Design a protein with these regions (language model features):
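Pre-Walker A adenine-sensing motif
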Residues: 1-11
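Hydrophobic anchor at the beta1->P-loop junction of P-loop NTPases
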Residues: 19
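The conserved Walker
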Residues: 23
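Conserved glycine(s) of the Walker
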Residues: 26
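Hydrophobic positions on the alpha1 helix immediately C-terminal to the Walker A/P-loop
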Residues: 29-30, 34
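Short beta-strand-centered segment that lines the nucleotide-binding/catalytic pocket of NTP-utilizing
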Residues: 38-53
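ATP-dependent small-molecule kinase phosphotransfer cores
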Residues: 58-162
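Conserved phosphate-donor/acceptor-positioning beta-strand/loop module used by diverse small-molecule
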Residues: 151-152, 169-185
Length: 185
């Protein structure tokens, strides 16, 4: 544990916190509130979609566009440019890429493809979480933020082993941030 008490944490001149909890519990709402009061907000989901999954997402858009002859011709001649427009508030390109297993004729993807994409997401999530210490430094050095909030996303529990004291993700986060778990009732 990085701090022995809440008082010790509050006395620090700069704060770095990672919010954990299941999807929908309010992590992003809290992170946005803190951002509005002067904290640097790091969204793991945003980082996943813009840094580590962007190429997969855009390639999927292009695969779909290639099914339409009009768009296929424009893509092949470099006449159009297709990009994802992921924002903190709109992660739809990421969730759409991850897809839903089911009949491809009805908009689903095969279970094998679904598992492949879930593994890509898992790897991207781990890498995004391991980026946190570097972003704390960047938030301070580049932007002048003293306080840092990491919105970890709802699937943190799927990429860490809390029983392993040497889990690389938990070790990195606990050495650089205060871990705050939010629970719903």
């Amino acid at each position: 544990m990085r701090f022995k008490s809440a008082q010790e944490f509050r006395k620090q001149p700069a704060h770095a916190v990672t919010i954990m909890g299941m999807s929908g519990v309010g992590k992003t709402t809290l992170a946005v509130m803190l951002q509005k009061s002067g904290w640097f907000q790091y969204s793991v989901d945003y980082r996943i979609g813009t840094r580590y999954m962007d190429e997969h997402i855009v390639d999927n858009f292009k695969r779909e566009a290639m099914k339409v002859p009009f768009l296929a011709g424009l893509l092949k001649s470099d006449s159009i440019y297709i990009r994802s427009n992921i924002t903190f508030d709109n992660l739809s390109p990421l969730s759409t890429y991850l897809g839903k297993p089911g009949n491809p004729a009805l908009g689903g993807i095969t279970f094998a493809e679904y598992k492949r994409r879930q593994n890509q997401h898992r790897d991207a999530e781990i890498r995004s979480l391991l980026d946190v210490p570097g972003f704390i430094e960047r938030a301070h050095e580049i932007y002048g933020y003293r306080h840092f909030i990491c919105d970890s996303g709802g699937s943190l529990c799927e990429v860490v082993n809390p029983d392993d004291p040497n889990d690389p993700v938990l070790k990195s986060l606990s050495e650089s941030t205060l871990l705050l778990n939010i629970e719903g009732n």
